Amino acid sequence: MVGGLDIFRERFSQFSDNFVIIGGTACDEILSGTGMRPRATMDIDIVVIVENMTSEFARAFWAFIAEGGYRLGVRKDKDEAPKYVLYSFDHGKVGFPVKVELLSRHNEIFTSAAHTEPLPIDGEVSSLSTIILDEPYYNLTVQNSFVSASLRYAAPLALMALKARAYLNLIADREAGKKINTKDILKHRNDVLKLTATLTGTDRAIVDAEIADTIRAFAEGLLQSLPNQSLQDALRSSEAAIRMFLEALPTYYTARQ
């Protein structure tokens, strides 16, 4: 379990309709009940459900940041107008999550309760935070979420789409000559495949065409890379099993007509 999640749950158990947890913490929640090993993570990434925003949640969040002794994280800024509001806090004190990142579309209720400025993120950052600001991905994540022990998490179908897009973005950036950490690429790749293994025959999502295209491109690219020993080692699976997962992956998403 992610360090500090218990105290986070204590403070926010009544606000499960106000936000969705994404990223590694959501993956950990889903995979912890399976035979697959969750990836270690130290942070909690939160997406605010703007339609359900309340002043009570805003006050509770800022009280938590103060109680945890967090400091404002540093992010790159190109002096461009922010497209959304991002708050990144790290170095939480003992017992709290090491890092908390909150993303929201601009919302006066939330920002007016803050005592610090939001962090604009430029277009070069390939992360779940930037991807989820696209309307189709935001809607998919909110609609495909579940509550477990009083906290709301993104469900596998949403996480897989976010991580497949992040993976493809990072690959494109690397091919364009940008310096990319290979670990970030492998992290998203492996998480998508692990999450695919948790799906059942009834799991389906109606999505915008761009999400269906993303899933198809992700699956086709990895199929072309087989046999892939790195993938087999990471998933502790055979080539045949990985091929089966990749071939099935696009069938879970149907493009909206």
Question: Could you tell me what each predicted segment is?
Answer:
Residues 1-257:
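Compositionally biased terminal segments of proteins
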